[in-house]
């Protein structure tokens, strides 16, 4: 049976829905897309290992060749949900219009596996000395469960890893982390005609906000990384809700905020800073202020700017490595081996209606991946 074409693989990936979401109404498994990847890669000679990470959630690990070290090409197999009313094309079909591939996951980032497939076909593997690995993870768009699972249970240690997120084929060597929390203030409701009979949660939240803004100033003052366009951590107050009526003392108020820590700031250290910032107001209002994570925190990531892997990939891409502010699975895979983020398409298309990947990325991406395979597997 002839091998499927690049286009057939791409179409198969996009037409197989694999949405992950914290909303159970949207959340799907990724088993169908993993099964397709397993079939395609095994046809190229890869050995396949599928790990059940959670119900309906799988990681795929594929290996071509033998020996130690080698190169790992990694990516996530899930996508975000979509707003059908804002799409002009079928999100679950590969539509070719305007020299672009349209569809959910074309850029972020199921399409990357089609490029791996095509690059492997283009390489003569007869003199291979080190293995090539492919990792397809689950739930990157929500909990990064797949990457966390792989890091904790990695069955091999490659020399290097490339994560194929959309970077416009510019190597990314560092990014900030992401921590999102809720602060819930519980007061005591009552009629507004007698404030003494209640405890106003909005007024307590006012004190909480002041403490967080002081923490924000402290983070800016004490932490700096010249490699980033925004060289300090950021703290954003993103959502607040409290009360239900102007003539009622507010009984509860909730704030959602996020922090984007620089590489090198430990998650435990940041957590301690946040609790220190709130300690005084919590002591003033015992039992009324609760800090709750909105998702598992993601640390910052950095591959040292002078690492040989950066020099090698920059030479292949003819692009200097850069830093970005968005998050990837790199902080986890970096624990296994030196890791860079590099892939086709623009991050501007990620999580957008009418997501697309421009045709202009096709040949350069296959060329870059083929050269990386030849450099690190031979």
From Swiss-Prot:
GO-annotated molecular function: acetylornithine deacetylase activity; zinc ion binding
Coiled-coil zones: none
Database matches in Pfam families: M20_dimer, Peptidase_M20
Free-text remark on how the cofactor is bound: Binds 2 Zn(2+) or Co(2+) ions per subunit.
Compartments, record wording: Cytoplasm
Positions annotated as active site in the UniProt record: 78, 140
Gene Ontology CC entries for this record: cytoplasm
Function recorded in the entry: Catalyzes the hydrolysis of the amide bond of N(2)-acetylated L-amino acids. Cleaves the acetyl group from N-acetyl-L-ornithine to form L-ornithine, an intermediate in L-arginine biosynthesis pathway, and a branchpoint in the synthesis of polyamines.
Name of protein: Acetylornithine deacetylase
Source organism per UniProt: Vibrio cholerae serotype O1 (strain ATCC 39315 / El Tor Inaba N16961)
Gene that produces this protein: argE
């Amino acid at each position: 049976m002839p091998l499927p074409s690049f286009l057939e693989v791409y179409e198969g990936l996009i037409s197989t829905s694999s949405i992950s979401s914290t909303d159970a109404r949207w959340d799907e498994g990724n088993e169908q897309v993993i099964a397709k990847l397993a079939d395609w890669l095994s046809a190229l000679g890869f050995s396949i290992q599928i790990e059940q990470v959670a119900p309906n959630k799988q990681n795929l690990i594929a290996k071509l060749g033998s020996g130690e070290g080698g190169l790992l090409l990694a990516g996530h197999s899930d996508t975000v949900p979509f707003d059908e009313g804002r799409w002009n094309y079928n999100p679950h079909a590969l539509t070719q219009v305007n020299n672009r591939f349209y569809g959910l996951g074309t850029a972020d980032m199921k399409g990357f596996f089609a490029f791996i497939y095509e690059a492997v076909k283009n390489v003569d593997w007869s003199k291979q000395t080190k293995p090539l690995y492919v990792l397809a993870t689950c739930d990157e768009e929500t909990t990064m469960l797949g990457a966390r699972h792989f890091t904790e249970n990695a069955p091999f240690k490659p020399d290097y890893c490339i994560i194929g997120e959309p970077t416009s084929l510019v190597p990314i060597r560092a990014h900030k982390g992401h921590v999102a929390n809720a602060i819930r203030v519980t007061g005591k409701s009552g009629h507004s005609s007698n404030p003494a009979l209640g405890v106003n949660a909005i007024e307590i939240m006012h004190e909480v906000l002041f403490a967080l803004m002081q923490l924000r100033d402290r983070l800016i003052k004490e932490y700096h990384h010249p490699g980033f366009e925004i060289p300090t951590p950021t703290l954003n107050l993103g959502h607040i809700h409290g009360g239900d009526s102007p003539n009622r003392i507010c009984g509860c108020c909730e704030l959602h905020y996020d922090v984007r820590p620089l590489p090198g700031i430990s998650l435990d250290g940041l957590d301690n800073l946040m609790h220190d910032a709130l300690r005084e107001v919590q002591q003033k209002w015992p039992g009324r202020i609760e800090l709750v994570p909105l998702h598992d925190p993601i640390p910052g990531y950095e591959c040292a700017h002078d690492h040989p892997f950066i020099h090698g990939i920059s030479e292949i891409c003819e692009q200097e490595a850069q830093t970005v502010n968005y998050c990837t699975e790199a902080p986890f895979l970096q624990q296994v081996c030196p890791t860079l983020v590099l892939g086709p398409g623009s991050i501007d298309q990620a999580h957008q209606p009418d997501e697309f990947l421009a045709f202009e990325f096709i040949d350069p991406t296959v060329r870059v991946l083929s050269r990386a395979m030849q450099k690190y597997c031979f």
